[in-house]
Amino acid sequence: MADDLRVRLHEVLSAHDPQRVDMPEARDAAVLIPIVAVPEPTLIFTVRTDTLSSHKGQISFPGGAIDATDPSPEAAALRETQEELGLDPASVEVLGELDTTPTFVTGYLVFPFVGWIERPPALDPNPAEVKEVLEVPITDLSGRIRREPGFEHRGRSYPTEAWVWNDYVIWGVTARLIRQFLDKVAATGYVEAPGDTTSWGAWPAPSAPS
């Protein structure tokens, strides 16, 4: 089942032409969407520490700003993942790329890459950047999304959508990346496409815009 998903997802992503948002004033960043194959296809998220300069305390995929020395956005995503989680880039098969996705107010344009990891990795999280590592089965996110009217920041309104998983709220740019990712996974037949629901009750308000 897992290998079948890998093959089909690679086919779907190979046929996808990633859309580039035109934001010349933005700072480019890259993230890896890591899928661990066994015991079932599972996503790795990080909970960022409260001492980081941006997106502090939020749940995110591993990644960060693209440096001038990075040969490509994909290389930056793998480098940042290794720095944050100690994950050997050689253990990651990059299946493809999603559309670039901007953060609303922090000025980043995110290049997202989907990576396949065949065996459970021995992670070594960097305590300066990572407070906690979350391992979330893809099927736990399938077909569910919580949409909210939005929030205000410096006089502007921003739409908000989020997943709630085991009392963790995954929102902001990470939630938008999950939606993109699940659309592609749904095209393989492994899960259903993301839905829209407001039936979960209250969830904590985001502490900072993303």
Protein language model annotation of sequence segments:
Residues 125-157:
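Amphipathic alpha-helical blocks and their helix-capping loop/short-beta junctions
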Residues 1-60, 65-121, 130, 151-153, ...:
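N-terminal leader/linker segments that precede catalytic domains of diphosphate-processing enzymes
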